[in-house]
Amino acid sequence: MKSKISEYTEKEFLEFVKDIYTNNKKKFPTEESHIQAVLEFKKLTEHPSGSDLLYYPNENREDSPAGVVKEVKEWRASKGLPGFKAG
């Protein structure tokens, strides 16, 4: 796994979020591996809401993987944090 969000393209990160959202058993065959992916999401995004972005979306956001990625992208930009790599 990549260690920084800036190592992901937006498309790659969206796929990662989709896999978490759907609990993709090919990517995360065990509950523990799924939990580790959620923890990795929290670490990568650095967002104060952490995994709540996945499970408890705010009312102003689309409840989907794309909505999660959009919120992360906008929040990181507003804080001057690096975004996704070009690609």
From Swiss-Prot:
Pfam families: Colicin_Pyocin (PF01320). Keywords: Bacteriocin immunity. InterPro entries: Colicin_E_sf, Colicin_pyocin. Belongs to the colicins ColE2/ColE8/ColE9 and pyocins S1/S2 family. One of its GO terms (molecular function) is toxic substance binding. This is Pyocin-S2 immunity protein. The keyword Protein transport does not apply. GO terms for biological process: bacteriocin immunity.
